[in-house]
Swiss-Prot record:
GO terms for cellular component: plasma membrane. Its main location: membrane. This is Sialic acid transporter NanT 1. It comes from Escherichia coli O6:H1 (strain CFT073 / ATCC 700928 / UPEC). It is found in: Cell inner membrane.
Length: 496
């Protein structure tokens, strides 16, 4: 940018169409967050009515993560082929329909299936909305675009908590899910009133349709084998999370089978750049493992361990959700200032100072607990607002929606595992200790993976001929693309 351009406030670099695109996608994220967290708010009520164990109840949260990998792949491919806008609308319709079905669910299995539908819609919303906004904004503002957008999910969670305190005590838990159908009205408006993403239009204007991940996996020479593997992965995940398997060895074998299938899909769809894709899945997996025990089971902890009433639970969750929303926006500014990876690492390190006090303080002082949660979530959860930008930078425009959607949502299986891990550990420790210890230990893994830029580093080790040296979104160099001690100026010469 020129000096004159740099002196202009960042928000003046955006025109009305770009702000409208952002506003529409942000509202979609808000509604997504609202629908998704409803189950966490009423988990104890559902558990009591259906007579579920704590692990079974936690699996209802996990269900939405089980289907996300497939939703991310299919709806992401739709976004790559037909445009980001259509994928956004389809995603909203899916998660709204699944939420309504939860309200009518007569038992555990029906609700589990409805949560699978929600997961598919949520995955599509994540991949399509993130790529839509990132590709609509100027390159130098795309950390902000990512962070500001993801804040909508946390705001939706805050709104859901407030609605919970007003609706459930009077009309019961099912009424909360009936409200979740409202986003379909928004989807109809969205279809008519927002423009297509600029990057996508430039790439596809007047050209033949791209070959998407769906084309590669399900219309190529290995389509029969891939369909069989897809069914095998879905069946294995079902038995792992809904089949009530007691044998840990069988669960481990099924988990390894799923991992092998997902790696196979990544190798087929990304070719020589598969090490980058696999490592991105690992990054996201651990990002969910550190964050989602708290996200999923915090309402249960507040209601059971601290014995808070619904109104107090809503107040505490307001601090938590609002902190995450603020953190997403702060993360956008940090990403522009420090760079995406450095901002991520610094924010997570700061959050580690607060995670133990959050669960050590107890419930005597609600306001102190709320403030601790606000800052911990701002630093620990909010920084994930720039994760779409971080992941998207490893993919070209042609495969960005599907690549981001599939990679992120396979890794998001950590979110399926996280609440169950928390519930299992809570059988031996109290729930607060379980949540705090999981989050504290696994955050360090994410710090190392992102701080060392392991996707680029492993790519350089295994398939250096396909190494991407610069971020595909903002053009900045990847630190892991060069060995330690090499001149970073070399990256400028090898920019791809």
């Amino acid at each position: 940018m020129s000096t004159t351009t740099q002196n202009i406030p960042w928000y003046r670099h955006l025109n009305r169409a770009q702000w409208r695109a952002f506003s529409a996608a942000w509202l979609g994220y808000l509604l997504d967050g609202f629908d998704f967290v409803l189950i966490a708010l009423v988990l104890t009520e559902v558990q009591g009515e259906f007579g579920l164990t704590t692990v079974q109840a936690a699996s209802l949260i996990s269900a939405a993560f089980i289907s996300r990998w497939f939703g991310g792949l299919m709806l992401g491919a739709m976004g790559d082929r037909y445009g980001r806008r259509l994928a956004m609308v389809t995603s909203i319709v899916l998660f709204s329909a699944g939420t309504l079905a939860c309200g009518f669910a007569p038992g555990y299995i029906t609700m589990f299936i409805a949560r699978l539908v929600i997961g598919m819609g949520m995955a599509g919303e994540y991949g399509s909305s993130a790529t839509y906004v990132i590709e609509s904004w100027p390159k130098h503002l795309r950390n902000k675009a990512s962070g500001f957008l993801i804040s909508g999910f946390s705001v939706g969670a805050v709104v859901a908590a407030q609605v919970y305190s007003l609706v459930v005590p009077v009309w019961g838990w099912r009424a909360l899910f009936f409200i979740g159908i409202l986003p379909i009205i928004f989807a109809l408006w969205l279809r008519k009133n927002i423009p297509e993403a600029e990057d996508w239009k430039e790439k596809h204007g007047g050209k033949a349709p791209v070959r998407t991940m769906v084309d590669i996996l399900y219309r190529g020479e290995h389509r029969i084998a891939n369909i069989v593997m897809t069914l095998a992965a879905a069946t294995a995940l079902w038995f792992c999370f809904a089949g009530n398997l007691q044998n840990a060895a069988i669960v481990a074998v099924l988990g390894l089978l799923c991992a092998a299938i997902f790696i196979s899909f990544m190798v087929q769809s990304t070719g020589k750049r598969w090490p980058t894709g696999v490592m991105l899945m690992v990054v996201v997996l651990f990002a969910f493992l550190y964050s989602w025990p708290i996200q999923a089971l915090l309402p249960t902890y507040l209601k059971t361990d601290l014995a808070y009433d619904p109104h107090t639970v809503a107040n505490v969750l307001f601090f938590s959700g609002f902190g995450a929303a603020v953190g997403c926006c702060v993360g956008g500014f940090l990403g522009e200032w420090l760079g995406t990876r450095k901002a991520y690492v610094c924010s997570l390190l700061a959050s580690q100072l607060l995670i133990i006090p959050v669960f050590a303080i107890g419930g005597a002082n609600v306001w102190v607990l709320g403030l601790l949660l606000f800052f911990q979530q701002m630093l620990g959860q909010g920084i994930s607002g720039i994760l779409p930008k971080l992941i998207g930078g490893y993919f070209d425009t042609d495969q960005r929606a599907a690549g981001l959607g599939f990679t992120y949502n396979v890794g998001a299986l950590g979110g399926a595992l996280a609440p169950i891990l928390g519930a299992l550990i809570a059988q031996r420790l109290d729930l607060g200790t379980a949540l705090g210890s999981l989050s504290f230990s696994l955050t360090f893994v994410v710090i190392l993976l992102i701080g060392l830029d392991m996707p680029s580093r492993v790519q350089r080790w295994l398939r250096p001929e396909a190494l991407r040296t610069h971020d595909a979104i903002d053009g900045k160099p990847f630190s892991g693309a060069v060995p330690f001690g090499s001149a970073k100026n070399d990256l400028v010469k090898t920019k791809s």
